[in-house]
Structures are given as structure tokens and as C-alpha cells.
A protein has these predicted regions:
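Active-site proximal loops enriched in glycine and acidic residues that flank catalytic Cys/His/Asp
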Residues: 48, 72, 100-101, 278, ...
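Active-site-proximal loop/turn and secondary-structure-junction residues that shape catalytic pockets
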Residues: 48-52, 72-74, 102-103, 150, ...
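C-terminal amphipathic alpha-helical interaction region
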Residues: 500-700
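Hydrophobic/aromatic-rich, well-ordered segments within soluble, folded domains that form packed cores
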Residues: 65, 69-73, 289-303, 329, ...
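Histidine/acidic residue-rich metal-binding segments in metalloenzymes
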Residues: 4-101, 106-121
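Composition- and surface-driven signal marking solvent-exposed, interaction-prone regions
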Residues: 214-215, 290, 312-313, 339-343, ...
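Glycine-rich, acidic/polar active-site loops that bind/position phosphate-bearing ligands
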Residues: 125-310, 319-322, 329-565
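Short linear, low-complexity motifs centered on an aromatic residue
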Residues: 77-94, 112, 211, 218-220, ...
Length: 700
């Protein structure tokens, strides 16, 4: 069968009201006003906003839209939307289609129904959405989607986009200050660029529908190890199965229509696991488009009789799914500030930005760990093919050797055996692509960017990039303050580089992060080892971290404490949901199935012993004993779990309550799951009520 021909350039961005559409359709002065708003942050007056709204509405209707929505990203980590039609009464028993300036720029939503950490009570319901003109509107399913921020009636942020935009602004300002010190007067803006590599699982819908835990929790709460997993490394980069390939083709087409630069797709390491990666874009747009990608992964999978699992650890014993956040800095003249240059001056600039990153990661390592901490990722980090929970930076041997020479004040011998004294006037040529890929590192320099590998597959990339942007802005600001006062810039820069790399070399680690020896070594270096969400959260409201975000006006102390409460409450609620789900599966299906099999064994044993012939009964006796003992042990653990849930304190009780949920609920849920795994390997397949890992992972 011939595949239909796709004109990709014509298809790309077809459903996006982007710069090209604006330039073609808006009056020149209105277009220039929008450009100033987008690049300089100048406000749009009502008249200009009204003209943009009218043109946007006409374009949307031409492309089949009948409704619009303010599309925002509340603290759930997902997106939210409320659809309104364009209709308005025309005064003659008919309607006309309109989108006013107010409807474009401002909306209202019930803020009390979203996570707010106490910022909004039920009786204080009003929240507002406001248009984000830096992210393009688009059409999906007959609705015009207008990207917006979300705040409370009193102006407190209730979303993930607002802090991201603020952090981008702060980073822009501090980067430009540094560039001016190097004599660069052309650059006006610097923007963080992000390319999120999205991992996911695809399984058959029929298998999914038979697993209550997958439907309610997004992951399996039990499952014995299958006879074959990922041991043969035969799935990674393997031939893509026809059903999956058809899904990927449709996914590409839908993403391209929405202006998403979907570039690379391949099979991942675990069976049924895959990855999609886009070309980089600015951090704000990348965040919006990753949310779209996750939504379309699920939606399009259902059209193919599949289910897309975005949970970080849907199956035990094989790789979980992450999201590698490739982060770099780009000027409005097209220069990548994390790319080594071809001249000593360019490399001095590169090393200064590198020093700021190293210093920031070391000083705020706990905050970086916090921004990727939530229940799903707790099951992944430190597991199969996932980074450890300890923050460190991989630099590669050659770049590390250059940094060592700076620290020691010695000559650096490059790969051509040429000796160079590290200085501003005699910087070494720093070759690209000399670093190997260290999959065990949570943060790796990969030639012209940093790859933050700790993100979970289901999370918004907003918070991790807020942290990266803000710590970088802080360190660059400190550097600029010092260098702007220097009488001799070159010697001051030399001193600053040596001082910074000396003070923070502990955060650089090029070894195997999976090795148990690294845990001991990290402790010796004084690096934090925060193993899970409950361990991480106190650092979220540490004075040092609150001071960082309030100083740069990214978040207020109240907003940070609210997010802290949201994370803790979410941890408790997710833990309780998983426990309730497991209890339901055990009491209604698993224990009855084990009992049915035990009864069958007992009957067989009885008949063998009473048939008048001496027959061996060792198999029935031992198996019956094992099934009975495991069932009794599972029953006891589930009784304890039920009692704990009955006595559980309210989920919004803070850190002590979260610790209680971890010790009393999560631990018992895990214990019960391990007992179920043992039962699964004993009980007759005909009696077992749920699909096994082998059934699920090899179903497509």
C-alpha cells in the first residue's frame, strides 16, 4: 500500500497564528506594536489588542474554529482550558462572531478548584488568566487556543508559566551585562533554548483495560519479572513495529500542524518504550509544545488501539521513562553562549558562562533536586538506567583537564601536545564533541549545551527550567557586579575563573553514577543525597532558596511556601490513591484467585491420597503450602494497610504527615506488591486475574 504524500513545509505551522500570519494580516503599526510587546515587554493598548483579536478570530474561523479558550498551566502540572464560542447576539435574533480585546487578553477561572497551597480558599474562588503574547495561539479540535498565565485575584501566581517567564527575563538581563563586559554591543537579548527528549511506553488498549492500577495510578503496583525483559538490548534503536510506526506518522503530522519541531523518534531500551525529540526552541515555547506533545501522545495512541503511558516507572525491573532537558543560551544574533569559540576571547567568555553554571549547580544543588521530585519520579531515580539522586556535573576528560589547569595555574597540554598557559589572551582551543555520553550523570555537558537528565516523563519542564534560569541569572549577576568594578578586566577575569572552579570542583564527576562507591564519595565531598520527595521538600523552603527566587522576583516567599505545601499534599494523595487501588485489586481479585487455586490444589491432593494408589504429592503439598502462606502474609499486610488508611491524617498536614504516609502507607503498599509478585509466579495462569508483564510489554 502506498503511503500518502505529505507536503511537510506546507503543513508545518498550518494551525498556528504565528509571526508570518501576523505580518501578513495585521496593519504594519499594529504588527510593530505586537513585536515590541513580545521582545521588549511594552504593554498593548486596548485598541491595538482589539485589532489583533479581530484578525486572530477571522483566521481561526477560516480554519474551522468556532470556540476559543485561555490555555494555562496550573500547579497540577497539566494544562487547563475553558471553551467559549465566538458568538454574541447581533440584536436581531441572530448572532455574529466576535473576539474582543478583553476576551483575548483576560479571562476568569475558578482558582479555588486548582492546587494553590492555601493561596485560594473555596470562598475566594476568583482567578484570572492573561494572554502571553510571547507564545503563539493555535487551533486544535475546532478551538482557538490562547496561551495564558494564571494568577489569583490578588496577583499571586497559580501556574507554572509565570515563574518561567520571569526567570527568562532575569537571565536575559544578566547575560547581556556579561556580554557588554566582553565588548559585545550588538546583542540585545539572550534566551534559554530547550529541547526536551520525551520518553513514553505504548501498550495495547485491551491489556490496559484489564489493569486497574494502570488506569487509576498510571503504573503497575505489582508484576513479577517476565522471562524476557531488556537483557538482550534488542529493542533500543530496533526496527519500529508497523502499528507503532503508523502511530508515529500520525503524531508527526499533528505536531507539525501545531508548529512543533518533531524531529527524532526511536525505540528506547525497555520493551514497549519509545522516545520523541524536537529541535530546540526558546524555553517558553518549548514548555508549551512539550505539553501539547504529551497530550497528543495520549490522544493519537487511542486512535490506534494503544495507550501511551507517561508515568516515570510504569513497570518494575526495566527502565523507567524520563525527559532529558537540553538547555543552552542563545543570543538574538544567533550565538550559542555554551559553545566553545574559535578565539581566546570567545573561549574566555565561554569559560565564564561555564563557571557560572558550575557555581550555580553546586550552590543550589538541593533546589535542582527538588524541582524533579514527585512520587512518580521517586520510583525512577536511582533505578534502571536513571540518574542517581545526587546532583553532579559531567564535563568529560578534556574539558575537565582544562578546568584543572585553570585551578592549578599550570599549562594545559591539548591533544596536539601544544602547551598553553590558560589566560584571557591565550585561551586554548576547546574542541567540540570530545565528551563521551555519560548516561549515569544527572547533568552533562554535551559539547554546546547541558543535558539535565533527572526530569520525569510526565512532568512539565517549566519548573526545572525556572531553577536553571534563576541560578544562572544569580551567578552571572554576581560575576557582573565584580567584573564591572575591576580596574583590570583580564586579570580580574582570570582570578574569578580560577577562584570559581577551585571552590566548586566537587560538583564535577565524570565517573559511574550507578556505582555504590559514588554514594560514599559524594558524601565525602559534601554533596546532598536527597533520596525522595519527602527528603527533598524541606530544602524547597530553605532560606537560601527563598532568598534566590525573591531577589530575582521569580517567586515570592508566599508563592514558594504554597508550592511546598502543594508538593507535600500531592505526595500524600498519590500515595493514598495507590494504596486504595492495591487494596481493591487484592481483596476483590488476587486473594480470591489465590484461594481458588489453593482449593484446586487441595482437591487434587485429596484425590491423590484417596485414590487407592500410592502417588507422589510433593508438588501439591509444597505449592499449596506456599500459596497459603503467601496469601496469609498478603492478607495481614493488607489488613495493616487498611487500618493505616483509616487512621491517616489529612493530606495537607505538612512535612510530618508526608513522612507518616511514606512510612505507614507507601512502605506497606510496596510490601504488599512484593508478596503479590511471589503469588503471581505460583498461581495457575487460568486463575490469575490480571495480565502479566509479559502479556503487556509484548502486546503491540
Amino acid at each position: 500500500m502506498c503511503e500518502k504524500k505529505i507536503d511537510v513545509p506546507a503543513l508545518f505551522g498550518k494551525m498556528v497564528f504565528g509571526e508570518q500570519q501576523m505580518q501578513q494580516r495585521l496593519p504594519a503599526e499594529v504588527y510593530r506594536a505586537w513585536q515590541r510587546c513580545r521582545t521588549q515587554g511594552t504593554a498593548l493598548d486596548r485598541s491595538t489588542a482589539g485589532e489583533i483579536a479581530a484578525v486572530m478570530k477571522d483566521w481561526a474561523i477560516e480554519n474551522g474554529a468556532t470556540h476559543y479558550t485561555h490555555w494555562f498551566q496550573p500547579m497540577t502540572g497539566y494544562t487547563a482550558e475553558k471553551h467559549d464560542s465566538f458568538i454574541t447576539p447581533d440584536g436581531a435574533e441572530g448572532v455574529r462572531m466576535e473576539l474582543s480585546a478583553k476576551e483575548l487578553t483576560k479571562g476568569e477561572a475558578d482558582a479555588s478548584s486548582f492546587p494553590s497551597g492555601g493561596l485560594r480558599a473555596t470562598f475566594e474562588a476568583r482567578g484570572y488568566t492573561a494572554w502571553d503574547p510571547t507564545s503563539y495561539a493555535f487551533i486544535k479540535d475546532g478551538t482557538l487556543y490562547i496561551p495564558t498565565i494564571f494568577c489569583s485575584y490578588s496577583g499571586q501566581t497559580l501556574d507554572k508559566k509565570t515563574p518561567l517567564l520571569r526567570s527568562i527575563r532575569e537571565l536575559d538581563r544578566e547575560c547581556v551585562r556579561i556580554l557588554r563586559l566582553f565588548g559585545n554591543t550588538e546583542v540585545q537579548h539572550v534566551t534559554p533554548q530547550v529541547g526536551p527528549e520525551q520518553e513514553y511506553f505504548l501498550i495495547d488498549r485491551e491489556m490496559y483495560d484489564l489493569r486497574e492500577d494502570l488506569k487509576l495510578c498510571g503504573r503497575t503496583l505489582f508484576g513479577a519479572r517476565p522471562p524476557k525483559g531488556q537483557e538482550l538490548d534488542d529493542h533500543y534503536y530496533g526496527a519500529i513495529k508497523p502499528r507503532v510506526a503508523a502511530f508515529m506518522r500520525e503524531l508527526d503530522e499533528e505536531l507539525w500542524k501545531l508548529g512543533v519541531l518533531a524531529k527524532t523518534e526511536h525505540n528506547e531500551v525497555a520493551p514497549a518504550q519509545h522516545e520523541i525529540a524536537p529541535i530546540y526552541s526558546d524555553a517558553n515555547t518549548a514548555c508549551d509544545k512539550n505539553q501539547l506533545t504529551m497530550e497528543l501522545l495520549k490522544k493519537i495512541a487511542s486512535r490506534h488501539g494503544l495507550v501511551c503511558l507517561l508515568h516515570e516507572k510504569p513497570f518494575a525491573g526495566i527502565n523507567g521513562s524520563g525527559k532529558h532537558d537540553n538547555w543552552s543560551l542563545q543570543t538574538d544574533t544567533g550565538e550559542n553562549l555554551l559553545k566553545p569559540g574559535g578565539t581566546p576571547s570567545q573561549n574566555a567568555q565561554f569559560l565564564l558562562f561555564l563557571a557560572a553554571f558550575v557555581k550555580g549547580v553546586d550552590e543550589y544543588q538541593e533546589m535542582l533536586r527538588c524541582c524533579v521530585s514527585y512520587p512518580g519520579n521517586d520510583h525512577r531515580l536511582g533505578g534502571n538506567e536513571a540518574p542517581p539522586a545526587i546532583i553532579s556535573i559531567f564535563m568529560g576528560d578534556e574539558l575537565t583537564a582544562i578546568l584543572d589547569s585553570i585551578v592549578q595555574g599550570t599549562a594545559y597540554v591539548d591533544i596536539t601536545k601544544k602547551k598553553l598557559k590558560i589566560g584571557v589572551d591565550a585561551m586554548p582551543e576547546i574542541p567540540q564533541d570530545t565528551t563521551d555520553r555519560n548516561r549515569t550523570s544527572p547533568l552533562a555537558f554535551t559539547g554546546n549545551k547541558f543535558e539535565f537528565r533527572m526530569l520525569g516523563s510526565s512532568q512539565s519542564i517549566a519548573s526545572p527550567n525556572v531553577v536553571l534560569n534563576t541560578i544562572m541569572a544569580e551567578e552571572l549577576g554576581q560575576f557582573a557586579d565584580r567584573l564591572e568594578k575591576a580596574a583590570d578586566f583580564q586579570s580580574a577575569l582570570q582570578e574569578l575563573l580560577q577562584e570559581t572552579f577551585t571552590a566548586h570542583q566537587r560538583i564535577i564527576f565524570n565517573g559511574n553514577g550507578y556505582d555504590d562507591a559514588w554514594v560514599a564519595e559524594a558524601a565525602r565531598r559534601g554533596l546532598a543525597n536527597l533520596r525522595d520527595t519527602v527528603d527533598c521538600m524541606p530544602a524547597y523552603i530553605d532560606k537560601k532558596n527563598i532568598d534566590l527566587f525573591t531577589k530575582h522576583a521569580v517567586l515570592t516567599e508566599t508563592e514558594m511556601r504554597a508550592r511546598y505545601e502543594i508538593h507535600l499534599e500531592n505526595y500524600c494523595k498519590v500515595t493514598a490513591i495507590e494504596a486504595h487501588t492495591l487494596l481493591d485489586m487484592v481483596t476483590r481479585c488476587i486473594l480470591p484467585a489465590a484461594g481458588k487455586y489453593a482449593d484446586s490444589l487441595a482437591q487434587t491432593l485429596f484425590h491423590k491420597k484417596n485414590c487407592g494408589i500410592s502417588l507422589p504429592t510433593v508438588m501439591e503439598e509444597r505449592t499449596l503450602t506456599r500459596v497459603s502462606e503467601q496469601s496469609a502474609a498478603l492478607f495481614r499486610v493488607c489488613e495493616d494497610l487498611q487500618t493505616a488508611l483509616h487512621n491517616a491524617p489529612a493530606a495537607d498536614g505538612g512535612i510530618d504527615v508526608a513522612r507518616w504516609y511514606r512510612a505507614e502507607i507507601a512502605a506497606r503498599t510496596q510490601q504488599a506488591g512484593e508478596l503479590i509478585n511471589q503469588l503471581e509466579t505460583i498461581v495457575d495462569t487460568a486463575c490469575w486475574p490480571y495480565p502479566t508483564y509479559a502479556d503487556i510489554l509484548f502486546s503491540v
